[in-house]
Amino acid sequence: MRTSEIVRDTAETKIRLKLDLDGTGKSNIATGVGFLDHMLTLFARHGRFDLDVTCDGDTYVDFHHTTEDIGIALGMAFTEALGEKRGIVRYGSTILPMDETLILSAVDISGRSFLAYDCDIPTQKVGDFDTELAEEFWYGFTRKAELTLHIKQLAGTNSHHIIDGTFKSVARTLKDAVAIDPAFADEIPSTKGVL
């Protein structure tokens, strides 16, 4: 079973997160940030991951710590669930449309953390969510998931659609990359023999 359970407590957030990479897209999300709940719900659905997240964060300050720390915890969960990464496809990419928006994402589950985030979100907020926090989420995730992630906005003018599109695109990309390749089910997908 490729599952993980993360408990991450700091002075700023208390996070409980469960992940099943081979799920059906079920989720139970309660972060205290409505827009982030929506993004994580659709991430689970489009990636076919089962995901439970609760967070008690210092949202009276702002949503920065909650958003970044959940990204960190989700990255930790992916690393734990993947183990030594035996048999995974490793790579994935998706070009995903959402109305006027078009998002490209590509991943290499390489063991090397790198984020290239190229999105031009036209407003500072979607509801009460600071749009710059989307990049903070992916930065935290990428660091702890130990993977290379490229997210590029190819088109789009609606801030909600752009962020929504990134979460859906990355979810589908990760779904493909973590899939087991039956032809190499017992092998590490690297000439080095380790990822």
What spans do the regions from the language model cover?
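N-terminal intrinsically disordered, cationic/polar leader segments
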Residues: 1-195
